[in-house]
Regions:
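Alpha-helical transmembrane segments and immediately membrane-proximal extracytoplasmic
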Residues: 1-398
Length: 398
């Protein structure tokens, strides 16, 4: 391609990225603000809502079966389109995944929101690209939408950009999409913030110097354990989804029956502490409040069980919660500042579980500031190496 043609095509993609960023940012603001309100309502009234989790599961399943069964594939469908294995994403996926996630959270399921935002962005950008007969490469449009979805919801445009270009193919950066993805992520973040969706950020007060042997070894241990935790999450989620699908093949039966013990355990153990996104645990970790030694493990178990039986929602915010709570505990055991270790865990467990490297480092920069960037790089690189190409997105292409 000649330089002039390349510049013209790039400008077309950037214009589309701006359009996608505005629309997806607005949808993210709606989705995120409603989800926050729902979460606050559930926290107050969980004893009346959790018993109806099985019924909510049946309603979610019925919605998909009636309106768009193909949309049940969720992120799998996004990856199939990105890897040219499929060429269609139903627009109905957007309202279905939003409503399904709201219901999951309202009635106490343990799940996230990032996967939902990414699906929203990818679906919209893919539809616009097809509608406008957009040139040549549908994958770039998909990456633009994924970056907008992530960036609009979390307002971390750098990590959103690198997440989107890293995640489609393991070990391969989609640099062709870099500038358009960056534009869509920044526009989406600006739009959602302008519409009242707040960004989460924390100033880390205590840091460490990598001067002593003990400190260096402790940081390496952190990276290894965070990496193993992300790997455990990804491996367990994949295996449990397969097991549930093979053991109880009827989706209505699977979600209706298995949600009964899920709701009971969520109710009994610390009164819905492990329901929802896990932002309560994240807030406690960075506020110096009570973090139990088993918080990270129970949040992991409840999240993979919720998602494996068919409820809707993402994985990333629970991963942030798992990393934060594990970091607090490990910080105390290793003699390192707990808040700093919580921040490192927040980023590194996410990176390991999603099998991304640059995205979690950028999360560290955008959420916690640049003062500890060297530590974030070291811990995230180690966690990424420990992971071994296992991802929550089983369809990532190696």
């Amino acid at each position: 391609m000649q330089k002039k043609d390349y510049i013209i095509q790039l400008l077309k993609y950037i214009i589309m990225a701006i359009v996608v960023g505005i629309i997806v940012g607005a949808i993210d603001a709606l989705f995120g603000r409603v989800l926050i309100a729902i979460s606050e309502f559930r926290t107050i009234h969980y004893q009346y809502l959790l018993p109806f989790l099985p019924i909510a599961g049946l309603v979610i399943t019925a919605m998909y079966y009636v309106f768009s069964k193909l949309s049940l594939k969720g992120m799998k469908l996004i990856f199939e389109v990105g890897q040219q294995k499929s060429d269609a994403i139903p627009l109905l996926l957007i309202p279905l995944v939003m409503i399904g996630t709201w219901l999951t959270h309202l009635f106490g399921g343990s799940a996230g929101r990032e996967g939902v935002a990414v699906q929203i962005g990818a679906t919209l950008s893919h539809a616009l690209g097809r509608k406008l007969n957009f040139p040549e490469n549908g994958r770039i449009m998909l990456v633009i939408g994924m970056a907008a979805g992530f960036g609009g919801l979390f307002q971390t445009p750098l990590s959103a950009t690198f997440f989107a270009i890293e995640v489609i193919v393991i070990g391969k950066m989609d640099y062709e999409a870099l500038l358009p993805a960056l534009a869509s992520a920044y526009i989406a973040a600006f739009t959602s913030h302008s519409l009242g969706l707040e960004k989460f950020s924390v100033a880390i007060k205590n840091t460490i110097n990598l001067t002593g042997t003990k400190t260096i070894i402790s940081v390496i241990i952190l990276g290894i354990l965070f990496g193993l935790t992300g790997r455990l999450f990804s491996f367990s989620l994949s295996k449990l989804k397969v097991f549930m699908g093979e053991t109880i093949m009827n989706q209505y039966l699977r979600i209706g029956v298995m949600a009964i013990p899920l709701a009971a355990l969520l109710f009994i153990i610390h009164g819905s502490r492990y329901s929802g996104l896990g932002t309560n645990i994240i807030s406690a970790g960075f506020a110096g409040q009570t973090i139990y030694s088993y918080d990270w493990f129970l949040k992991l178990l409840f999240t993979i069980f919720t998602l494996a039986i068919g409820f809707q929602g993402g994985e990333v915010t629970p991963l942030f919660s798992i990393g934060t709570s594990l970091g607090v505990i490990l910080g105390g055991l290793l003699g390192l500042p707990p808040m700093l270790c919580a921040a490192l865990g927040y980023a590194a467990v996410f990176g390991s579980a999603t099998n991304t490297l640059i995205a979690p480092i950028m999360i560290g920069l955008e959420v916690f500031g640049g003062a500890d960037m060297v530590l974030f790089v070291i811990v995230c690189v180690i966690a990424y190496g420990v992971n071994g190409n296992i991802s929550i997105y089983a369809q990532e292409k190696i």
